[in-house]
Amino acid sequence: MAVLENLEPKKVFHFFEEISEVPRGTFNIKGISDYCTKFAKDRNLEVVQDEVGNVVIKKPGTTGYENSAPVILQGHMDMVCEKRPDSNHDFTKDPLELQIVDGNVVAKDTTLGGDNGIALAMAMALLDSCLLYTSPSPRDGATSR
C-alpha cells in the first residue's frame, strides 16, 4: 500500500511518492532527471534533457488556446540530504521512507526533500491532468475536461 495514497490532491501525492523513490541529492540528479524525462515521453510531451540533467517539458495548449502565452512551472530536482546520526540511510541509492506522523508527511530519519519535491509533483500532476480548459473560454460557461 502506498503511504500517501489517501492524501489529497491524489495525483500530487502519487507523484511525490514516486519522486521520493528516486535518490536525488545535490550532484546526484541523473536518476530524477531520467525519471522526469521518461514521465514526459510516456505522455508524448516534448522534452529536452541537457548534459547536466536539466529537464524542460512542454505541453501544447488545448483547443482554442494553442497561441496563448505559455505558463512556466519550475522546481529544482535535488534535495538537501541530512539524516539522524544513527541512520544507515545512503542518499546515493536508498529511497526515502515516507511516513505520516501526527498528520504530517515526514521521512524516517532523513530530510523529506519536500520543498521542491512537491513542486515537481505539482507540475507533473498538472502535466498529467485532463483538467485543462478547452474552447470556448471558461468565462463563457465552458466546463473543464
Residue ranges and their predicted role:
Residues 52, 110, 139:
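An acidic- and aromatic-residue-enriched active-site/binding cleft used to recognize and process polar
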Residues 26, 112-113:
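Short acidic-aromatic active-site loops that bind/stabilize oxyanions
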Residues 115-122:
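Catalytic-loop motifs flanking and including active-site residues across diverse enzymes
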Residues 133-140:
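Conserved small/polar residues in nucleotide/adenosyl-binding loops
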Residues 4-102:
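Acidic/His- and Gly-rich active-site-bordering loop/insert found
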Residues 106-112:
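Short pre-catalytic strand/loop immediately N-terminal to key active-site residues, enriched for Gly-Thr
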Residues 142-145:
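N-terminal low-complexity segments that are often proline-rich with Ser/Thr-Pro
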Residues 125-132:
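Flexible, small-residue-rich helix->loop connector segments that border functional cores
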